């Protein structure tokens, strides 16, 4: 799934993921600090199926894959994904900002833009799964009035997760 045109904010724009973004994304996701709370495998557990899935992200029929880019210098600073459910009323999101750009307001601006985009696409609910220990991400979702829907434990990475929901 792809958007027809970039989503443009004050400091960032969100564009469709392309194969040229693969190395940036995998370096960020596999980084021990940056990828700590992600559900992606660590580099040593990446298999052929995962590699194929990453290769196919740019043209996935099941979800949107985005790159977050700074307007001032065109630097890639993060990734974002969004998966509509079968009713196309609920969209589940995930995001990762490169650690060099943490605590600079980019995730806030990005989430605001994605919420606005989701509203224009007629989604009624946004869900996001976040590690309970990922305080910055939990606070970001709280800032936008996401509410905890349920808590679970993800055995693979040994973190309790919260699935949060926002009705829009």
Range-by-range predicted roles:
Residues 56-62:
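Short loop/turn motifs at secondary-structure junctions and domain boundaries
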Residues 33-53:
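Conserved GNAT-fold acetyl-CoA-binding loop/helix
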Residues 1-2, 53-56:
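Short, P/G- and charge-enriched loop/turn segments at secondary-structure junctions
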């Amino acid at each position: 799934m792809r958007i027809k045109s970039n989503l443009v904010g004050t400091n960032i724009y969100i564009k469709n993921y392309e194969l040229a973004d693969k190395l940036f994304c995998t370096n960020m996701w596999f980084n021990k600090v940056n990828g700590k709370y992600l559900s992606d495998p660590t580099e040593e557990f990446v298999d052929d199926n995962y590699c194929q899935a990453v290769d196919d992200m740019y043209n996935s029929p099941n979800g949107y894959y985005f790159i977050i880019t700074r307007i001032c210098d065109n630097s890639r600073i993060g990734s974002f994904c969004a998966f509509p459910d079968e009713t196309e009323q609920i969209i589940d999101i995930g995001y990762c900002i490169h650690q060099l750009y943490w605590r600079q307001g980019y995730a806030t601006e990005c989430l605001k833009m994605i919420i606005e985009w989701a509203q224009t696409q007629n989604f009624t609910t946004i869900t996001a799964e976040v590690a309970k220990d990922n305080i910055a991400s939990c606070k970001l979702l709280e800032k936008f009035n996401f509410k905890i829907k349920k808590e679970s434990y993800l055995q693979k990475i040994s973190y309790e997760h919260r699935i949060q929901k926002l009705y829009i």
